[in-house]
Each structure stands twice: as structure tokens, then as C-alpha cells.
RNA sequence: GCCCUGAUAGUGUAGCGGAUAUCACGUAGGACUGCGGAUCCUAUUACCCGGGUUCAAGUCCCGGUCAGGGCACCA
């Protein structure tokens, strides 16, 4: 409906300009005025035309106003200075909007564009920690947004099963006492993390271990110890998957990088790169990208002939190029240089250059995290803490059976975490503080509460969905603002998908909840003259809040 | 040293070159609590510095300052 009123506004201006014999600019600019006294849409065409016509904007506006015809969806068109302001007829508009809102509100028709979206892809050398969480939450939310916007999306987790880090864990298994089960921790990924930490300690004391690890890598690329490597990775990954499941983060496919070495793809990639003429060789084979503005050459193979992460990544990206129309990667900004090198290499070989979404780091107040040094807060810890704090809040307010309270607490805890990350633009550096991440007084819990409140109201009124919208219903004030915001939701989805951004959805959910709460205070629903219309409105808010939260991977409980 | 990214109220944050800069927390008042108070209303305080482009700059360009990151035969 929002797009519809934009179109009506543009059409009316176009018609007016044609009537005046003025050449119509390619795009008629519209914006949303800063306050309701200035209407619902405003156009700045006169500013733009002023330069070309050598006339004052205000005069051009006056001319347009003299001939413009008001489309039926608008009540009036007025000029405020040089602006042309459109005022929506909220009686007509609101009814039409409510008729159009279904369960899947916000969804766009299929776009016939396949997106391969890689995210999380943390190394299986320990549990996910809060440094990884940003990748997972941005990636998963973006996948949901793209799907709602009509894209065909496949999410992939790229599993590093052959890097030095994994080889170190295998070394530990071969050389230290005890099997993985003997390491402390409830979850498999935590045990692997402990072992990894242990091996790092040994390595510090005895640098000679490094050669042994190199030997393991070499042998593995030649096909030895395959089961052992696989076992370690699967073991760790299964623990990580549990965590992601609890966070509501989903991947359609796990792609193991080792496959690209074993099936010869990496060798073929290296051969093809040689043929491009951009490679050079001393002890190692490298790619010289100076011509593309990158001073640092990209090393493709170690001196012992084994491959490197980036080399395998090139092979992986060529595969993704085959699978999708649009390739999106979510990466920490520390990968900027490497990603640029890989992107250029992929293009050299005729693949599609990925769009990369970079995010800045999450650090602890005392500094950065490190799996190697054992300094991190795991996502499991974070979620447990979120749950127990949320449970405390739930119990403080209401007396509920334990299992119900538990479910609600889980939704609220998860919501707090996901919202904490999703609401920020990715280029902001985050310093993690427990009380910021887990605040229930406001933030996500208040959005979930607005949803629960809507549910309760509908239940109380025995809402069926068949209620009629009364004649003469014409929203004003808070109610009008609520209608306006509802109409915007599909636009927010579309724009977020196009910009590959998640946080506008988070902001929108907050705005909608706030506006609904104000409306709830100021406007009676049950027993009012417009009970039918308002119940339909509340139901529409309910659906929209639920769908918006769902885009962020957050569950909206019906009671809390 | 070179490269990338940030800088907006006490704190955290949004902002397509356009009319009075968003939201949240905090603080201080207040409301109502008969559709659930995890509520509502009011007040409060901000675009790092210096140049430039433009009818119009928080937004674009150049130069500083501060902060984070990168510049591996790690990933």
C-alpha cells in the first residue's frame, strides 16, 4: 500500500508537469516529511527543476499546484513553501490496508534470483564465543530478510577441516594422554576447545611441535589420517550446532573445505591461476595483484606444497559462483584484505565476485578474545545467563507453571541477545558488557510484550478475523501513526534486503511496538464505536510484530 | 609507516544531499493502573576539529585528531 501511494503521488505530479509543458525528470523525488502537519509524502521536484528552468522553486510549485489533480487515495495536496505535500485519506487508506494484511504480511513475490549466503563458518576448534555471534546473527537474519523479500536463499557454513588449527588438535589427540571424552566440559565443542588450548600451551613450551603439526598437514593433504581429522571436526561441530540451534541460527548446508583438495579442484585452480600470468614463484607460489591496487601478494601454496586457506577459499567461491546468481559472505573486518584478494582471484578465473558484509569486532572491556589463549565468553554461557536472568524477571511478575515460565524465559533471553546484535549497524565496534547485552527492562522484551499484549486483547474480545470495518472509521493521532507504520513494513523488508542490512528491521520493530503501546493507552478498542476496525488493526499489528521479530530470529510469545 | 572502518545528548545508537536530527538507557517530574505497569506523558542534553563542493552538508570531497582492525608459508 505504501508503494501504491507513492506511485499515485508521482503519477499526479507527472501529469501536472506534462500539462505545464515541463520536461519530466527521470525520477520524481519523494520523501517522508518530518512531522504529520506536513502530510505523508512530500516532493522536492521543484528544487530540482529550479536549476534547469532558472526559476524560483516556490514559483514552480505554485504552477504545479494550479493544475495538479488529487488522486482518490489522497485527501488533499498542499504546498508548504517549495515542497508539494500529499495528505493521505486515512479513512479509505486504512480500510484497504487492513484488508491486504495476511499472515505472511511483508512477503514479496519470488524474484527468481538465487543467493548463496555464507555465514558463521567459525573454525571447529572450540565452542562459539561472543566474537562469532555477530557473524551468525547478522547472517541468519539477513537470510530471513532476503527470503521474505522474495529471493531464493541457500545458507552455507564453510567448515575448515584442514587448517593448522585442526591439525594441532589432531596432534594433541595423537600425542597427549586421553581421548576427547576425557576433557572437561558438558559439550563436545567445549572439550575440543580445552584440548586446543592445551596443545597451544605445549607449543609455547616446545616450538618443535610446530614441525610435527606441519607433517600432519602434509600427510592429511596426501590422504592420511582422514578419519581422525573428520572425527575431530564432526565432534566439535555437533556441539556448535547445538548452540546455533538454540540461537535459532540455521544453515542449509555445511561445505567442508577438504573436499576441494581431495577432488583436485585446488590443483586445477592453481593451474588456472598460473595461466592468467599473475603468479610468481620463489620458495612459494604467489599471486601478484599489484595491478589491482593490492601491494601484498597472495601466497597460494606453502613451500612444502600444501595449500592455504585462501587458495581453498578461491575453489569454494568458484563452486558458489556456479550455484547462485548472487554470492554473499559475512566476514569480520579482519578478513578485508584476504577477501579482496580472493575476490579478485575468483574474478580472474571467471567466477562471480562475492558481496562481502564486514562487521567490526566484539571485544571484552579488558581486550580481545582468543580461543587459542582460552580467553572468551562462550555463546552457551551467554545464553544460560540470559535464560536465568529472564526467568528471574518472569517469575517476579507472574506466577506461572515452571515449564511455561521456562519457555517464555528462553524466548526473552534469546531475543535480548539477538536484538542486542541485530540493532547495530555492523561497522560499529562493540565492547561487550553483560548488562548491555541482557537488558530486559526495555529493548527486545518490550517488543515481545507489545505482541503478547495484542494477543491478549484479541483473545479477550474473542476475535475471529471476520469482523467488519465500520463505516466512518478514520484514524487520527496515534491510531493514524500506527496505520502509517504498518503500511511501511513491506518497504522496510525490501529496502533492508536490497541494502543487505539487518538493523532497519530491528529499529522498525521497536518503533511499531512503541506506537502500538501509545495507541493502546490512548485509544479504547473493546466497546468502542469502531471495535471491529480496531480489532482488525490490533490483529495486523500482532502479525507484523511477529513477522518482524521472526526476521531477526526472535520468537514472539503469546503470553509473557 | 601504509591501508580499511568508526566518531551524533551523561551512555549506547538511527539517519536516501533537503523543512523542527531517530530510538533506547539514564536523570527529574507526572499519569493511569476497569483492553495486562515489561505501560503512557512531559522535561533534559548531541552531529570530533579545519577547509571545500552545493540553492541546500550530520550526510559528499580534502586535511587533521582520537579509537578499532589489517599489512603471515594463520584462519
Curated annotation (Swiss-Prot):
Provide the Gene Ontology terms for cellular component. Answer: cytoplasm
Which superkingdom does the taxonomy of this entry point to?
Archaea
Can you say where in the cell this protein is located? Cytoplasm
Instruction: Give the SUPFAM superfamilies listed for this entry.
Output: Anticodon-binding domain of a subclass of class I aminoacyl-tRNA synthetases (SSF47323), Arginyl-tRNA synthetase (ArgRS), N-terminal 'additional' domain (SSF55190), Nucleotidylyl transferase (SSF52374)
Molecular function in Gene Ontology: arginine-tRNA ligase activity; ATP binding
Q: Name one GO biological process term.
A: arginyl-tRNA aminoacylation
According to its UniProt record, the EC number is 6.1.1.19
Q: Which InterPro entries match?
A: aa-tRNA-synth_I_CS, Arg-tRNA-ligase, Arg-tRNA-synth_N, Arg-tRNA-synth_N_sf, ArgRS_core, DALR_anticod-bd, Rossmann-like_a/b/a_fold, tRNAsynth_Ia_anticodon-bd
Catalytic activity field: tRNA(Arg) + L-arginine + ATP = L-arginyl-tRNA(Arg) + AMP + diphosphate
Q: Residue numbers of motif 'HIGH' region? A: 122-132
- EC main class here is ligase
- Keyword list, A-Z: Aminoacyl-tRNA synthetase, ATP-binding, Cytoplasm, Ligase, Nucleotide-binding, Protein biosynthesis
Family membership, please give it: Belongs to the class-I aminoacyl-tRNA synthetase family.
Q: What is this protein called?
A: Arginine--tRNA ligase
Record the organism: Methanothermobacter thermautotrophicus (strain ATCC 29096 / DSM 1053 / JCM 10044 / NBRC 100330 / Delta H) (Methanobacterium thermoautotrophicum)
Amino acid at each position: 500500500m505504501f508503494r501504491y501511494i507513492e506511485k499515485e503521488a508521482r503519477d499526479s505530479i507527472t501529469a501536472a508537469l506534462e500539462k505545464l509543458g515541463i520536461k519530466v525528470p527521470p525520477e520524481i523525488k519523494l520523501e517522508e516529511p518530518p512531522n504529520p502537519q506536513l502530510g505523508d509524502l512530500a516532493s522536492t521536484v521543484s528544487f530540482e527543476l529550479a536549476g534547469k528552468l532558472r526559476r524560483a522553486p516556490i514559483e514552480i510549485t505554485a504552477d504545479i499546484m494550479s493544475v495538479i489533480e488529487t488522486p482518490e487515495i489522497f485527501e488533499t495536496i498542499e504546498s508548504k513553501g517549495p515542497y508539494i505535500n500529499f495528505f493521505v485519506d486515512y479513512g479509505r487508506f486504512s480500510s484497504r490496508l487492513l484488508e491486504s494484511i495476511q499472515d505472511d504480511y511483508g512477503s514479496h513475490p519470488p524474484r527468481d534470483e538465487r543467493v548463496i549466503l555464507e555465514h558463521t563458518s567459525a573454525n571447529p576448534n572450540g565452542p562459539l564465543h561472543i566474537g562469532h555471534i555477530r557473524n551468525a546473527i547478522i547472517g541468519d537474519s539477513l537470510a530471513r530478510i532476503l527470503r521474505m523479500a522474495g529471493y531464493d536463499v541457500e545458507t552455507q557454513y564453510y567448515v575448515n577441516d584442514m587448517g593448522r588449527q585442526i591439525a594441532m588438535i589432531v596432534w594433541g589427540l595423537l600425542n597427549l594422554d586421553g581421548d576427547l571424552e576425557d576433557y572437561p566440559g558438558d559439550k563436545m565443542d567445549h572439550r575440543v576447545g580445552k584440548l586446543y588450548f592445551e596443545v597451544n600451551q605445549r607449543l609455547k613450551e616446545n616450538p618443535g611441535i610446530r614441525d610435527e603439526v606441519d607433517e600432519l598437514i602434509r600427510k592429511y593433504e596426501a590422504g592420511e589420517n582422514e578419519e581422525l581429522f573428520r572425527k575431530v571436526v564432526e565432534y566439535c561441530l555437533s556441539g556448535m550446532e547445538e548452540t546455533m540451534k538454540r540461537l535459532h541460527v540455521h544453515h542449509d548446508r555445511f561445505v567442508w573445505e577438504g573436499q576441494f583438495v581431495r577432488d583436485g579442484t585446488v590443483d586445477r585452480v592453481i593451474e588456472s591461476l598460473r595461466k592468467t600470468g599473475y603468479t610468481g614463484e620463489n620458495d612459494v607460489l604467489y599471486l601478484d595483484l599489484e595491478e589491482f591496487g593490492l601491494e601484498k601478494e597472495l601466497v597460494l601454496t606453502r613451500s612444502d606444497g600444501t595449500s592455504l586457506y585462501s587458495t581453498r577459499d578461491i575453489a569454494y567461491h568458484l563452486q558458489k559462483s556456479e550455484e547462485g546468481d548472487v554470492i554473499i559472505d559475512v566476514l569480520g573486518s579482519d578478513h578485508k584484505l584476504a577477501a579482496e584478494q580472493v575476490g579478485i582471484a575468483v574474478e580472474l578465473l571467471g567466477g562471480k565476485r562475492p558481496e562481502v558484509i564486514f562487521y567490526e569486532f566484539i571485544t571484552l572491556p579488558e581486550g580481545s578474545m582468543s580461543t587459542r589463549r582460552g580467553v572468551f565468553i562462550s555463546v552457551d554461557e551467554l545464553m544460560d545467563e540470559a535464560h536465568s536472568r529472564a526467568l528471574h524477571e518472569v517469575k517476579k511478575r507472574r506466577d506461572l507453571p515452571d515449564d511455561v515460565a521456562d519457555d517464555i524465559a528462553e524466548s526473552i533471553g534469546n531475543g535480548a541477545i539477538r536484538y542486542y546484535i541485530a540493532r547495530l549497524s555492523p561497522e560499529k565496534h562493540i565492547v561487550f558488557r553483560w548488562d548491555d547485552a541482557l537488558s530486559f527492562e526495555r529493548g527486545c522484551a518490550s517488543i515481545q510484550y507489545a505482541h503478547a499484549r495484542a494477543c491478549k486483547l484479541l483473545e479477550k474480545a474473542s476475535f475471529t478475523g471476520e469482523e467488519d470495518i465500520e463505516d466512518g472509521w478514520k484514524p487520527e493521532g496515534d491510531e493514524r501513526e500506527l496505520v502509517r507504520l504498518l503500511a511501511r513494513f513491506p518497504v522496510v523488508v525490501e529496502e533492508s534486503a536490497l541494502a543487505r542490512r539487518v538493523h532497519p528491521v530491528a529499529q522498525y520493530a521497536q518503533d511499531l511496538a512503541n506506537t502500538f503501546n501509545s495507541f493502546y493507552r490512548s485509544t479504547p478498542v473493546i466497546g468502542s464505536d469502531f471495535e471491529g476496525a480496531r480489532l482488525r488493526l490490533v490483529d495486523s499489528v500482532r502479525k507484523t510484530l511477529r513477522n518482524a521479530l521472526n526476521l531477526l530470529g526472535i520468537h514472539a510469545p503469546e503470553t509473557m
